[in-house]
């Protein structure tokens, strides 16, 4: 029955893969990735300013203002910045479809989107200048609107050559300025017109109007059904091999970051921070140790199984999973597309967010009010992200216990299956050894090989003689680091001229020309056709990997080097 259910879900895989590659959703996701240094930097000052309050220490007003200035001048402008980074990402996607000699200038689209955003989100101040109330997280939806309109208008103009053309004698940089003038002007006029219409009709700016329009949706998303559907989708998509966050994250990005800001404001006012859907909820509650809430799973494989294979997989997966990189257990066990683990893989994240919601709404625990790096270990992320409250420690322990209870019966079933397989192979191998020993004497062959100096190291020789730079891409840069590290270690050990780097898909466009080979981790393998347009244009080799194959390469440096070599032989 479980196999039939998985087969039905897999029928929708092509549609969801296409959805994950949607250029607008990808632009939102990549726009946030580009702005992440700003988001994380600002959170440092929140922690310094307000965590001491828990221990009875409060900064004086002057010092608090000093500590909050970096936050207000960075996170307070995040929507303004995201308008530009989202426009840049969308421009890259449109440029793939345009001739290489007639490309959209991404710097110009970034500037136009940011200027257009100011028309839609800022109000004039009485003493000159403009107000910034909607330039932070409240203006994120408007930032996306500005970015999308900007790039669509630029694409329309550039594709149809609706630009000012200069004589060939004019330097290219000057010609580009005039080429951008018409689309830039068109964007500003369109967005300014929209601003005038909304202000005259509804007596508010566009950002405020959009926020009011989506407010019922934000409220519904924070409810029991909302969190179940949203966060259950993360695991459900990943289980059938589709990177769930690529689909779900862009759809809820504006809500998660707006709620973080709202929770912080509530805490500042001495009130209860009760917004459930936040970036912290996603990273440290729902994906507690990675998608599927797998923090406890490697430890369970290591300590609660009898199979040698399962114990080895657990040991190899513990460290990366502890830091949120759970592909070694996802594809090594495997958990994904494994009928035995379908129920716990989807159920554990949902139960986790239900428990968190109970802690917040019934026990009065504060929700997340600080953005932290996604690689922060789950328990530590819960404690730090919610302000070091007592309930956060209790919650972290509770989630660990509950997730063990959810996974345990299914793990025992799976371990029993693997044990039976191991026993079968053991008997088969024993019979085979006896037959070989009875019919062949390998001692003579072994002595000849030893005398000739043939060793394992000789077999590890590589045909790669020129410096080869390899870029490994995944969704966030964590999983890709596993393979990049394996390649670098093996290259150093066997003296092969290979250098590997890890990166996140979406942040690769400006650096890919420095590499001879790009390898896609399973998370982003569905983007193969899109990135191939770029690699073909630049003369770069491109390879994609499957789950178990990728994990094998991360654990076997020689195999990883062989994989690199094969890409240049094909």
UniProtKB/Swiss-Prot annotation:
Record-annotated PTS EIIC type-3 domain positions: 9-410
Top EC class for this record: transferase
Residue span, PTS EIIB type-3 domain: 467-570
Notes on the domains: The EIIC type-3 domain forms the PTS system translocation channel and contains the specific substrate-binding site.
Organism: Staphylococcus aureus (strain COL)
E.C. number: 2.7.1.207
Active site: 474
Membrane topology designation: Multi-pass membrane protein
Pfam family, one: PTS_IIB
Protein name as catalogued: PTS system lactose-specific EIICB component
Protein purpose: The phosphoenolpyruvate-dependent sugar phosphotransferase system (sugar PTS), a major carbohydrate active transport system, catalyzes the phosphorylation of incoming sugar substrates concomitantly with their translocation across the cell membrane. The enzyme II LacEF PTS system is involved in lactose transport.
């Amino acid at each position: 029955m479980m196999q039939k259910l998985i087969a039905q879900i897999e029928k929708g895989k092509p549609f969801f893969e296409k959805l994950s590659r949607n250029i607008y959703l990808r632009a939102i996701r990549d726009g946030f990735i580009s702005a992440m240094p700003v988001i994380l930097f600002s959170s440092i000052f929140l922690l310094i300013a307000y965590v001491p309050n828990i221990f009875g220490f409060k900064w004086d007003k002057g010092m608090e203002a000093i500590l909050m200035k970096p936050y207000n001048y960075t996170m307070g402008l995040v929507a303004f910045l995201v308008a530009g980074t989202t426009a840049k990402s969308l421009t890259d996607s449109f440029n793939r479809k345009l001739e290489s000699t007639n490309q959209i200038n991404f710097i110009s689209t970034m500037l136009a989107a940011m200027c257009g955003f100011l028309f839609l989100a800022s109000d004039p101040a009485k003493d000159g200048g403009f107000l910034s109330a909607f330039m932070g997280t409240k203006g994120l939806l408007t930032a996306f609107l500005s970015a999308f309109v900007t790039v669509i208008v630029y694409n329309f103009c550039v594709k149809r050559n609706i630009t000012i053309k200069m004589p060939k004698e004019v330097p290219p940089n000057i010609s580009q300025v005039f080429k951008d003038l018409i689309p830039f002007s068109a964007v500003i006029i369109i967005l300014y017109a929209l601003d005038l219409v909304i202000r005259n009709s509804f007596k508010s700016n566009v950002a405020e109007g959009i926020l009011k329009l989506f407010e019922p949706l934000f409220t519904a998303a924070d409810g029991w059904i909302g969190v179940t559907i949203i966060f259950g989708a993360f695991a459900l998509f990943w289980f059938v091999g589709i990177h769930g966050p690529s689909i779900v994250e862009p759809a809820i990005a504006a809500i998660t970051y707006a709620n973080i800001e709202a929770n912080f404001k509530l805490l500042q006012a001495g009130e209860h921070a009760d917004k459930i859907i936040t970036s912290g909820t996603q990273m440290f509650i729902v994906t507690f140790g990675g998608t599927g809430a797998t923090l406890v799973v490697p430890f369970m494989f290591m300590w609660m199984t009898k199979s040698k294979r399962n114990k080895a997989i657990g040991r190899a997966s513990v460290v990366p999973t502890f830091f949120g990189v759970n592909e070694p257990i996802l594809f090594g066990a495997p958990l994904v597309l494994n009928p035995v683990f379908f129920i716990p893989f989807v159920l554990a994240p949902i139960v986790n967010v239900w428990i968190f919601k109970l802690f917040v709404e019934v026990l009065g625990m504060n929700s997340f009010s600080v953005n932290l790096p996604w690689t922060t270990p789950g328990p530590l992320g819960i404690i730090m992200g919610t302000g070091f409250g007592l309930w956060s420690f209790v919650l972290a322990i509770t989630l660990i216990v509950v997730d063990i209870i959810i996974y345990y019966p299914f793990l025992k079933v799976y371990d029993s299956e693997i044990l039976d397989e191991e026993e079968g192979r053991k008997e088969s191998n024993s019979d085979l050894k006896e037959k070989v020993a009875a019919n062949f004497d390998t001692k003579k062959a072994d002595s000849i090989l030893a005398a000739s100096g043939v060793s394992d190291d000789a077999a590890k020789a590589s045909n790669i003689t020129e410096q080869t730079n390899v870029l490994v891409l995944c969704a966030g840069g964590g999983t890709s680091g596993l393979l990049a590290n394996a390649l670098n270690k093996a290259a150093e050990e066997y003296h092969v001229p290979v250098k590997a780097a890890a990166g996140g898909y979406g942040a690769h466009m400006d650096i890919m020309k420095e590499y001879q080979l790009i390898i896609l981790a399973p998370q982003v393998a569905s983007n193969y056709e899109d990135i191939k347009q770029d690699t073909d244009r630049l003369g770069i080799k491109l390879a994609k990997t499957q789950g178990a194959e990728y994990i094998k390469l991360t654990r076997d440096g020689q195999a990883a080097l062989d994989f690199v070599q094969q890409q240049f032989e094909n």
